[in-house]
């Protein structure tokens, strides 16, 4: 049996990346919340 997590940079960025967050209103809310919390890293 293989491990379930097979990391790929492209697919991760497509779902969790900065540009994908900016492309939707809810994604922008996520970024705003992370800025308000003071996260050093906003997105993947």
UniProtKB/Swiss-Prot annotation:
Family matches, as InterPro entries: Ribosomal_bL34, Ribosomal_bL34_CS
CC terms in the record's Gene Ontology section: ribonucleoprotein complex; ribosome
GO-annotated molecular function: structural constituent of ribosome
Residues in the signal sequence: none
Pfam families: Ribosomal_L34
Renumbered residue ranges of the record's region Disordered: 1-44
Compositionally biased intervals (Basic residues): 7-19, 31-44
UniProt entry keywords in alphabetical sequence: Ribonucleoprotein, Ribosomal protein
Any one Gene Ontology BP term: translation
Cell membrane listed as a keyword: no
Domain of life: Bacteria
Family stated for the protein in its record: Belongs to the bacterial ribosomal protein bL34 family.
Protein name, UniProt field: Large ribosomal subunit protein bL34
UniProt organism field: Lachnoclostridium phytofermentans (strain ATCC 700394 / DSM 18823 / ISDg) (Clostridium phytofermentans)
Gene from which this protein is expressed: rpmH
């Amino acid at each position: 049996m293989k491990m379930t997590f097979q990391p790929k940079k492209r697919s991760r960025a497509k779902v969790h990346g900065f540009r994908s967050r900016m492309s939707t209103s809810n994604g922008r809310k996520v970024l705003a919340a992370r800025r308000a919390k003071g996260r050093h890293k906003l997105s993947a």
